[in-house]
C-alpha cells in the first residue's frame, strides 16, 4: 500500500477547509480500490458510504482514514524493528516479578500488593484511564467538557469569603481567560501558591458559564514538571471486588514508573502468540506494541484510549475473548472423548409418569426433557445448561429425567448450594418419586455422624438411588455404586473444582451432567459464558401463574407499603421483608437487621414476625423457614431469600433500599412470591434522595417495574453492571479478563466474532500445532479453572 501517496491525496482534498473535496466525485471508490488489500473492514465500510455523506461527515471520514494511515506507517516501522528482535518463549514471562533486575525492592513489593506475581502479570496490568497532559491546546481552542492541560500566567487573585468559591485565580495564555475556582475555609493560606505574573500549568475539566471559562479545583503544576507534555496512564487496584483508582499519589507514581520501565525494556522480547492469519485479518498491531503503547502512549487520541476503542485496546480485548472461547471449546472437545453411561429410556413408562402429574407440563418443559433424554441415551457425556426464569419449573424436569436414569440402573447426585435448598429439593424429589420405588436421601453438613455413616453405606451399596445434598456430596467418604447423572443447581455458586470432584465419582464412566440456573442470561452471552455446555431454555411459565405486580415507593410513602402488607395479612397470606447487607462489619449488619425486625414487630404487634440472617447456623435457618411456612406471618431477612425457596402462601415481597441490588438479584427475590394462583406483589422501597429522574439507580428500577421477563432484565443488567453481576462471579476471576468488559457493547460484539474465530481455528487445527506460545498461555490462564492440562 502506497501510504505516502494516499496521505498526500487526502491532505490535498482537505486543504482550505476541503475546497477540492466539495467539487470531487467518486472519492470513496477511488480510495477503496487503493486500500482494499490492507485496510481493516471498518475503514473500507466507511469508504463505501463516504460519497453519499454530507460534507462535514465526509471530512470526518477522510480524517479517520488519514489517522489510520499514520498509525499503519508507524506500526510497519516498529514491526520491522520487532522482526529483527529475538523474541523469547512465553513461559519466560511467567517467572516471578522478583527476578526482574531493573525494579527496586520497593517497586516489587508495591506491584505484589496489586496482585502482580509474574512478569506477564505486570506487562498486562494495563491502566484503566489516561490523562492528557500534552500541552497541545489553548484556552481559545480547548473543548468545554473535556479535561485539558493549559500553560497560563496568573493575572489576578481574588478572595471571596462569603461566596461558594472562596478563592478565584484569573489566568491567561494570550488567547483568552480562564478562572480557577477553589473552595477553602481559609483562602488566605493559598495566596502564596498563586502570585501575579507566575507561570503555571493547570489540568482539569474545562467548564463554561455565560461565556466565562473556568476549572474547579484543578491540578496545578510547575511548567518544568516531568508529567507534562505526556499522556499519563492512571492505574487502578481491585478492592472488595471493585476497581478503584490508586489514590495515593506516591504509590500511583511508583506503579507508573515501574510498569513504564518494565514495558519499555521488555516489550520487544514478548512473543506474538496469535496465529498470523488472525492478525492480518483484523489488521491488528503486534501484541508487543500493545504492551508498549498502552503503558506509555505517545501519539494516540486520549478519547479513544479512555473509551477502549483504539487499535491497541481492541487487540488486547479481542485476545482475551478469543482465549476464553478457545478454552471453553477445548474443554467441550475433551469431555466428548470420555465414556458415559448409556441410559435406556423407557418412553411409555415416562409418558405415564408425566400423565400422572397433578399439573400439565408446559411446551418448554416438554422440549427440555426431550433434549436431555436424547443426550442421556448416548454414551457421550451430556454437559447441558438448563436455563429458566424464576418459577418456570426446572425442578420437575430434573426429577423426571432422574427417574429415567434410576430406571436404567444408575444413581443420581443432586448438588445444591445451601441446606435450606437441599431440604426443599429432598422433599420434592421424595414426594414425586415415592410411587416408583425410588429411594431418595439427604446429605448435608448438619446430619449427625451416625446419620452420615448410614447414608455413606447405602449409597455405596446402591440402595440409595438419588442423593440430594450440599457440597458434602464431594467428600472422599461419599462413594457411589454406579453414578450416572449429576445435577448441579445454581452453577455459579460452585467452583469448577467442586463440579469436577463430583463428576469424578463416576467410577470409570463419566456421569452425565445437568447444570440448572435460575439466573436468565441472554442467549448470546450464555453461549459465551457457558460455551462448554449445550443449552436448554424454559421460556414459559406454568399456566395459572399470575404476573407479580411490582411497585416503586419512596421512603416518604412507606405508609402505603404497610397498608398493603396489612391487607394481605388479613387475607391469610405471608410477607417477606428484605434488607441489603450494607455495613462492612457483620456485627453492624446483624444489629441493623435486629433493629428492623423489632420495628416490624412494633408495626404488627398481633402478627408472628420472624428474623432470618446470614450468620445463623444452617439448622437455625431451617427451623426459622419451617416456622414461617407453618405459622409465621412476616419474615424479615438480611440474606437474599434462598433461590428456589417455595412458600406458596407468600404473596408480598418488600425490598428495602432496592437501589442497592442488581436487577437480576431483584428478579430472583421477586420470584419468591407469586408461586400460586393468588395475586402477588413486589414492593420496592428507596430513599427520597434518589428522586431525581436522572438518577441511574432510579432509571434501572423503573425498567424493573415495567417487565417481569427475566431475560429482558438480564439484558438490562448486562448493559449496566456486566456479566459478573448476573452470574455472580467477577470478570477478572472467572473469565480471566483484565481489559475486556462485557458491560461494554463493543466488547460484547467482539465476543461473537472471537467465538467464531476460535471454532474455526479448532476445526482446522484441533491440537493447536505450531502454536506453542498460545498453548502455554491457555494453560497459564485457564489450566486450573477448566482442567486444560491436556493442551500441554
Swiss-Prot record:
Residues 134-229 are annotated as: Wedge domain. One of its GO terms (biological process) is DNA repair. CDD domains: DEXHc_RecG (cd17992), RecG_wedge_OBF (cd04488), SF2_C_RecG (cd18811). Gene3D superfamilies: Nucleic acid-binding proteins, P-loop containing nucleotide triphosphate hydrolases. Keywords: ATP-binding, DNA damage, DNA recombination, DNA repair, DNA-binding, Helicase, Hydrolase, Isomerase, Nucleotide-binding. Pfam families: DEAD, Helicase_C, RecG_dom3_C, RecG_wedge. Residues 557-719 form the Helicase C-terminal domain. InterPro entries: ATP-dep_DNA_helicase_RecG (IPR004609), DEAD/DEAH_box_helicase_dom (IPR011545), Helicase_ATP-bd (IPR014001), Helicase_C-like (IPR001650), NA-bd_OB-fold (IPR012340), P-loop_NTPase (IPR027417), RecG/Mfd (IPR047112), RecG_dom3_C (IPR045562). Residues 375-538 form the Helicase ATP-binding domain. PROSITE patterns: HELICASE_ATP_BIND_1 (PS51192), HELICASE_CTER (PS51194). It comes from the Bacteria. It catalyses: Couples ATP hydrolysis with the unwinding of duplex DNA by translocating in the 3'-5' direction; ATP + H2O = ADP + phosphate + H(+). Its EC number is 5.6.2.4. A motif (DEAH box) lies at residues 489-492. It is an enzyme of class 5 (isomerase). GO terms for molecular function: ATP binding; ATP hydrolysis activity; DNA binding; DNA helicase activity. ATP binds at residues 388-395. Optimum temperature is 60 degrees Celsius for unwinding of Holliday junction DNA, higher temperatures could not be tested, nor could unwinding of partial replication forks. The N-terminal extension (residues 1-86) is not required for DNA-binding or HJ unwinding in vitro. The wedge domain within the N-terminus inserts into the replication fork junction, where the lagging and leading strand split. Monomer. Belongs to the helicase family. RecG subfamily. Binds and unwinds Holliday junction (HJ) and partial replication fork DNA. Plays a critical role in recombination and DNA repair. Helps process Holliday junction intermediates to mature products by catalyzing branch migration. Has replication fork regression activity, unwinds stalled or blocked replication forks to make a HJ that can be resolved. Has a DNA unwinding activity characteristic of a DNA helicase with 3'-5' polarity. PANTHER family: ATP-DEPENDENT DNA HELICASE HOMOLOG RECG, CHLOROPLASTIC (PTHR47964:SF1). This is ATP-dependent DNA helicase RecG.
Amino acid at each position: 500500500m502506497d501510504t505516502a501517496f494516499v496521505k498526500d491525496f487526502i491532505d490535498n482534498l482537505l486543504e482550505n477547509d476541503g475546497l477540492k473535496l466539495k467539487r470531487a466525485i467518486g472519492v470513496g471508490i477511488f480510495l477503496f480500490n487503493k486500500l482494499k488489500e490492507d485496510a481493516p473492514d471498518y475503514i473500507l465500510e466507511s469508504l463505501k458510504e463516504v460519497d453519499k455523506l454530507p460534507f462535514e461527515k465526509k471530512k470526518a471520514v477522510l480524517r479517520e482514514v488519514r489517522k489510520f494511515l499514520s498509525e499503519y506507517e508507524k506500526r510497519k516501522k516498529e514491526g520491522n524493528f520487532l522482526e529483527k528482535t529475538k523474541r523469547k518463549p512465553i513461559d519466560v514471562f511467567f517467572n516471578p516479578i522478583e527476578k526482574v533486575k531493573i525494579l527496586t525492592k520497593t517497586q516489587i513489593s508495591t506491584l505484589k500488593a496489586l496482585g502482580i506475581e509474574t512478569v506477564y502479570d505486570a506487562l498486562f496490568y494495563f491502566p484503566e484511564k489516561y490523562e492528557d497532559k500534552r500541552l497541545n491546546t489553548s484556552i481559545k481552542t480547548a473543548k468545554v467538557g473535556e479535561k485539558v492541560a493549559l500553560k497560563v500566567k496568573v493575572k489576578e487573585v481574588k478572595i471571596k469569603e462569603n461566596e461558594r468559591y472562596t478563592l478565584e485565580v484569573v489566568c491567561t495564555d494570550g488567547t483568552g481567560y480562564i478562572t480557577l475556582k477553589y473552595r477553602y475555609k481559609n483562602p488566605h493560606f493559598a495566596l502564596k501558591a498563586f502570585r501575579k505574573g507566575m507561570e503555571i500549568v493547570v489540568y482539569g475539566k474545562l467548564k463554561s458559564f455565560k461565556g466565562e471559562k473556568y476549572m474547579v479545583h484543578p491540578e496545578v503544576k510547575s511548567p518544568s514538571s516531568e508529567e507534562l507534555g505526556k499522556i499519563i496512564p492512571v492505574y487502578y487496584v481491585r478492592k472488595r471486588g471493585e476497581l478503584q483508582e490508586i489514590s495515593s499519589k506516591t504509590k500511583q507514581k511508583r506503579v507508573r514508573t515501574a510498569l513504564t520501565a518494565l514495558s519499555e525494556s521488555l516489550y520487544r522480547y514478548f512473543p506474538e502468540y496469535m496465529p498470523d492469519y488472525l492478525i492480518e485479518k483484523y489488521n491488528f498491531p503486534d501484541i508487543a506494541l500493545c504492551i508498549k503503547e498502552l503503558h506509555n502512549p505517545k501519539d494516540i487520541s486520549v478519547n479513544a484510549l479512555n473509551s477502549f476503542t483504539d487499535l491497541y485496546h481492541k487487540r488486547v480485548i479481542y485476545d482475551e475473548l478469543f482465549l476464553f472461547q478457545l478454552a471453553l471449546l477445548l474443554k467441550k472437545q475433551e469431555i466428548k472423548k470420555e465414556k458415559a453411561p448409556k441410559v435406556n429410556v423407557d418412553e411409555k413408562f415416562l409418558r405415564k409418569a408425566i400423565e400422572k402429574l397433578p399439573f400439565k407440563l408446559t411446551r418448554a418443559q416438554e422440549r427440555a426433557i426431550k433434549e436431555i433424554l436424547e443426550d442421556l441415551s448416548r454414551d457421550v457425556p451430556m454437559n447441558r445448561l438448563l436455563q429458566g426464569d424464576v418459577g418456570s419449573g426446572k425442578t420437575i424436569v430434573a426429577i423426571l429425567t432422574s427417574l429415567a436414569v434410576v430406571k436404567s440402573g444408575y444413581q443420581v447426585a443432586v448438588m445444591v448450594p445451601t441446606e435450606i435448598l437441599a431440604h426443599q429439593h429432598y422433599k420434592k424429589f421424595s414426594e414425586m418419586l415415592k410411587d416408583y420405588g425410588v429411594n431418595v436421601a439427604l446429605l448435608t453438613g448438619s446430619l449427625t455422624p451416625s446419620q452420615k455413616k448410614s447414608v455413606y453405606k447405602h449409597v455405596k451399596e446402591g440402595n440409595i438411588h438419588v442423593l440430594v445434598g450440599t457440597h458434602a456430596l464431594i467428600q472422599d467418604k461419599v462413594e457411589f455404586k454406579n453414578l450416572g447423572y449429576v445435577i448441579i443447581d445454581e452453577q455459579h455458586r460452585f467452583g469448577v473444582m467442586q463440579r469436577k470432584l463430583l463428576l469424578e465419582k463416576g467410577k470409570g464412566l463419566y456421569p452425565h451432567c445437568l447444570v440448572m440456573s435460575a439466573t436468565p442470561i441472554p442467549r448470546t452471552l450464555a453461549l459465551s459464558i457457558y460455551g462448554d455446555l449445550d443449552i436448554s431454555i424454559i421460556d414459559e411459565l406454568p399456566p395459572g401463574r399470575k404476573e407479580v405486580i411490582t411497585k416503586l415507593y419512596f421512603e416518604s410513602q412507606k405508609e402505603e407499603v404497610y397498608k398493603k402488607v396489612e391487607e394481605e395479612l388479613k387475607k391469610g397470606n405471608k410477607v417477606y421483608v428484605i434488607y441489603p447487607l450494607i455495613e462492612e462489619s457483620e456485627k453492624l449488619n446483624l444489629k441493623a437487621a435486629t433493629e428492623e425486625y423489632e420495628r416490624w414487630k412494633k408495626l404488627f404487634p398481633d402478627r408472628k414476625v420472624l428474623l432470618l440472617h446470614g450468620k445463623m447456623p444452617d439448622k437455625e435457618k431451617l427451623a426459622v423457614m419451617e416456622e414461617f411456612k407453618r405459622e409465621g406471618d412476616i419474615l424479615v431477612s438480611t440474606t437474599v431469600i434462598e433461590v428456589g425457596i417455595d412458600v406458596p402462601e407468600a404473596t408480598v415481597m418488600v425490598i428495602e433500599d432496592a437501589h442497592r441490588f442488581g436487577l437480576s438479584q431483584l428478579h430472583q427475590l421477586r420470584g419468591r412470591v407469586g408461586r400460586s394462583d393468588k395475586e402477588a406483589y413486589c414492593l420496592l422501597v428507596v430513599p427520597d434522595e434518589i428522586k431525581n429522574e436522572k438518577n441511574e439507580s432510579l432509571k434501572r428500577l423503573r425498567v424493573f417495574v415495567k417487565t417481569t421477563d427475566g431475560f429482558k432484565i438480564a439484558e438490562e443488567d448486562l448493559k449496566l453492571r456486566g456479566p459478573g453481576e448476573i452470574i455472580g462471579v467477577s470478570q477478572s476471576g472467572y473469565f480471566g479478563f483484565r481489559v475486556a468488559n462485557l458491560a461494554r457493547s463493543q466488547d460484547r460484539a467482539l465476543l461473537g466474532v472471537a467465538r467464531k474465530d476460535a471454532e474455526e481455528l479448532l476445526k482446522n487445527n484441533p491440537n493447536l500445532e505450531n502454536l506453542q506460545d498460545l498453548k502455554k498461555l491457555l494453560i497459564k490462564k485457564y489450566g486450573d479453572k477448566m482442567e486444560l492440562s491436556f493442551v500441554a
